[in-house]
Amino acid sequence: LPGNVIYELIHNDRVIGGLNAASTNKAIEFYSQFVKGQLHKTNCRTAEMCKLTENSSRDVQIAFANELSLICDKAGINVWELIELANKHPRVNILQPGCGVGGHCIAVDPYFITAEYPTESKLIATARGINNYKSLWCAEKVKTAILEFELQNKRKPVVAMMGLAFKPNIDDLRESPSKNIVSRVIQICNNADILIVEPNVKEHNQFKLTEYKEAYGKADIVVMLTAHDQFKTLPYDEGKVILDFCGV
């Protein structure tokens, strides 16, 4: 529950299913001491599948948004404007695209379903593939921008990779697509001067981090990977190449 741990721990509903009635009742007794949300009793298989379903559902919805972003890029349409307009329909609620899906739940839980039921879970598996591919696509877009800059300016660019966390305003990097994109860009674009930014982390064991204002100021190419609030305060500079993969 990165970001709202205490609130969600207390206020979220709980689906509880033990191995038998006694264990289920004990779990309900425990959670009722601090949970203000409703406690829903079921069996253990349904409870486990409920958790996997919640996260797989989110993954599928994000995959639709990410696929739209790929289509819009090729069609020359602003995906953010498109989604905002489409969501004005009362029965449409498209999520925001990003550079993939991360975290230790949404990016992981669908595999438990697809591994056990591969024939029946084609939509879930396809969504996982789309969200994984989006990260590779983002890295290739950065590579293209670097090559175009070099051709036009006869020098290597300074590239600011903005954000490592898997979602805004947290310091959790688990399964982060942003981190994977940075690693891939470093691998395939080793002639570029790459500055790596994560304002919610003091240091990282793999990457040397640069303060976000400093990186933005020095950069020729700015790659928005995570929509941290700090990045939204940066002044627009038309002299920079901006690749915004997260809607900053």
Describe each model-derived feature in a short phrase:
Residues L1-V248:
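Structural/interface elements that position substrates and couple domains in central-metabolism enzymes
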